[in-house]
Amino acid sequence: MTGHPGPATGADRLRSAALLTATAAQVLVPVVGPLLGQRPVGEVSKETPSIVTPPDWAFGVWGPIFAGSAATAVVQALPGHRTEPASREAGWWLAAAATGNAAWEFVAQSGRYRATPPILWGIVAAAGAAHAALQRTAPTATARLATGSNGMLLGWTALAAAINTADVLLATLSIAPDSRRGRAVSLGLVGGAAAGVTAVVAASRRGAAAVASTTSWGLSTLAATTARTSVRATAWAGVSGVAGGLLARVAKTRRTRDLFG
């Protein structure tokens, strides 16, 4: 990795520290919270009925997302990389996304699950802004790492925000998820999220496959485990749409590695 010439400023060091702190927080909150009396996120979320939540094992996707985020934070904090365009252009957005993740985990674990949708959409907005910023930077190794790890976060949280919003909205309005209206809301939001991700994937010069991978993972695990035909059809249609967006991007991409970061 080649650093950007020029000495690091106080702003560079502050940004790097913020990113490291936020990245550590998003990993530690789910571990420390239950030790301090909070309930695990999975336990709290199951109290809100849903027909569109992927199976528990699908959430293992957070492993590679967190690993990529940690690697990005460490690399951007190194003296030779604090001043890289990728660090300066996207660092604060990456820190905002990680902070949002930690906040979402804390609020959910404290039992206020219905307050979480706005936080999730904030994460999506921050990750989306970072993704857009990274499209404009030179494709250095540092930039590729950030683009890939953030792309996975963007793809997963875009779907998660739609599912979370549907579940909380139906619970707030006392609408049964498996009713006609409930299915319309849930499947409409999931389909809308898939369409939005498809558009992002098709338009991304770099990191398209990273974004597509986690959305497709969530949708395909949902489709493979649900007993509801309408949910299965919507999920597979979403996977097909995202795959179509990725194929459109592949046709325009000269370097295969650009698809990943």
Regions found by a protein language model. Give the residues of each.
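Short amphipathic, positively biased membrane-proximal segments
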Residues: 1-261
